[in-house]
């Protein structure tokens, strides 16, 4: 018979059983429904009683195979027999039927969702508790609902949906990892239990993140699910199970629940993943072979979970019939997708009417349950089940339930938040972006932009020089908006400063966008209105500023270099002026000497002087002129006597210093001499050795080389290579003292000129901070100084002994460090006796002598010295300021423009 009523099959059944009008009776015994949902009913008996469900589509090629008899039939009364599907179980689905419930008045305390979905028996200490408050806070059943892992992220639910065309991301993602707990590779297959009708929008599905809220599903573990085993009796992982709502449910912000229209059908999709090849199901009676898998769909009431709401399905002729369980095939390691369409609730929820325009506080809700079963010998065993959040089922959709103006505005998941799924326009009715504001906007905080490198690709550094050129081409103008445009756009301040979009488009096209036509207040239409992206221009400014910083740094470096050169030029100018004044003084002194030493025959010069002073003699008497001449002659005589006295004193001082020469002239076998003549020049003092010289540490390589053989000791038949360095040094000293006694006035004038305040500011320290032998890290310090000669005031002499076990092929590297960038000149070097006499060694010596550096500059100066092949050697280095002195500079500028260093190396054979 055809079902035409709203309660349809169930109502007919209760009328047939004499229970008319008791559908809503709380005392109704629901054992028959419980038996149908949870017990292992007899499929054969149902097949003999129930007709097949006709296909609901004109094309039944995609219709799922239906279970004959295992459905909600249009039942007819039978005499003395309770239909098998409605036997009541009190245990698990695999257990035999037990006694039915005695009463339903206490369903709030002891309830059970049959078919193996919920088992919520309360006790004295454990009352029924609601589900997770974040999902469905009004469900009155105490069941555990752990989050099912989703395709996107485990535990995350898809956003709610309101549009019918919105589906889940699994529809387009190719069944990506639906169940992340199992990582076995799998393929995907899909089947559909419906053919889309003309108004179906299954072909226009959108990604989930662009949709409205979607109905949430959660697994229910109130009754233990049965496990699957393979042919080897190995337990398989839990079945991956996921239910997705395709369409038919709209979220109502006012009711804070999803609403389904009874006359409109809804559609759901189930994704099932089995791991391995299931052959057996584990029951309380042991292992049972699996014959087939089935899907069941039914509804339940939130306030009375024992009451089952039948689900109907529209047929091809627009009629409705009870939905039959769907027979499905599950392949190993594959995702099976089953789509159930054209479904309807057979009833509506109670208390749907509003009170004073507000939701009814006594509103009742349904929940939708989808279960997966394994069948064996007409018995069903629950494998997995999902239950939805609360649903309101209404008979129609009058205007009192939904306000069109609030259709897009919803409450967000975060407290005190409102969400709008669509475009928002302020002072405009045609927003073309997510938010369009015509008018001023105040932002007290900051505007954030996505900038994470993980969300970017093709990252390339821009040319800041090009950005600077583009910014230089942009024109900044002042302008006034037209009144009709300002009024239409909500602009209060018409006069502004900015850029012209057309000009910016020629320079930086990506910073200009067309936003369509804009209508002004007077009706004028501006076609293809241009707007400027100031963020792009701001980034161009950042690049231009970086380029300007580079240019500024380069200019600062060049300015610093120019300042250094200017200081050097000023220093040279002062030096040249001082030299010119000194030369003038020397010419005056020479001319005065020539006048005093000239004979009477050279009277012509006196006439010239008379002519020169002719103008003054007319004004001055003769005695004044004679007095001046006598005074000048007396001064010159005094200067000459002073010079002679200083010269004599210097000779005496030199005689005192000659006996105190360093022990380098000793001709004994203990310490070598530079020349035989040097020892004969002072036979009485050659053996004199100061105690300090004996305590000076030797230059030895015994720590890095074996010290077994003695080199260059004793010296026999040494070849004279050059004059003694000490003798030559004493000769230079005598020459310098002679020059100093003759030109004392010049040196005094020079030091006075250099002691001025201008020169003191540019003073350069030309002394050496440290000296060492690099190979052995031997420091040459003040203990090597020859105090008898000079060790300070611009002249330093070092007497350095070398160990007798030092090989002749050892390299001596002298490291000189200065505190300022200076130039070190090697003015002279003198080599003593050679430590070998073969021609081969002599050739090597000659080639070694040819290699000589002339100067180094900087802070660190390294000189390679030929010390080892000789019994003694002397080196003269001059440390000078740049561009102020060299080897030819007057020695009296020592300590001012340069500092001289003399190093005397000799082998100590004692």
From Swiss-Prot:
DNA-binding region(s) in UniProt: 142-405
A Pfam family recorded for this sequence: MYRF_ICA
GO biological process: positive regulation of DNA-templated transcription; protein autoprocessing
Cysteines engaged in disulfide bonds, as pairs: none
GO terms for cellular component: endoplasmic reticulum membrane; nucleus
MF term (GO), any: sequence-specific DNA binding
Membrane topology: Single-pass membrane protein
Keyword annotations: Coiled coil, DNA-binding, Membrane, Transmembrane, Transmembrane helix
Region span, Disordered: 189-208, 661-682
Localisation: Membrane
UniProt KW ATP-binding keyword: no
Record protein name field: Myelin regulatory factor-like protein
Natural source organism: Homo sapiens (Human)
